[in-house]
Amino acid sequence: MPLSVFELVLMGRYAHLKSSFSGYSQHDIAMVDEILQTFGLAKFKERVASSLSGGEFARALLARAVVSEPKVLILDEPTSALDLSHAIDVLKLCSKLTRELNLVTIAVLHDLNLASLICDEILMLKGGVIAHKGSAKELYVPEILEEIYGLRGDIIYKNDMPFVLPK
């Protein structure tokens, strides 16, 4: 049976159940209602989750993670298959939640320019091993980009943030 958006997000409270048979509390239900409102998903509460757009579904998955009250939020390509506008919205929401909820957020991102917008610290891997660690300003230099990605390009700055323009 397909899950509603409410049910999908409520799954994030499962770890807080007193037992597998106890059911969700009024507190759990209130938390989900509040987070649906915060994430702009309240109007989709009864809708089948799989019918959401890519951006809406990404927000629903993020809401499910946040309603579990984590200390660390681990995101694997949270912008995958999203258009640029929705990708930026999701990352801004992640950044806001990280600050407001005092979370540590670890995200796998393959878009250097999106990472530049959102990440305080970046780890660059080569062969599955950390090769470089630092801010976008420290890492987005021609030598490192060529070493890690085999990429030649220009680094431009906008609002004091570096962006990569491949050649």
Language-model features: locations:
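Conserved ABC ATPase "signature" region
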Residues: 10, 25-44
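Conserved ABC ATPase signature
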Residues: 48-52, 56
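Helical segment within the ABC ATPase nucleotide-binding domain
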Residues: 88-101
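Conserved switch/coupling elements of ABC/ABC-like ATPase nucleotide-binding domains
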Residues: 123, 127-138
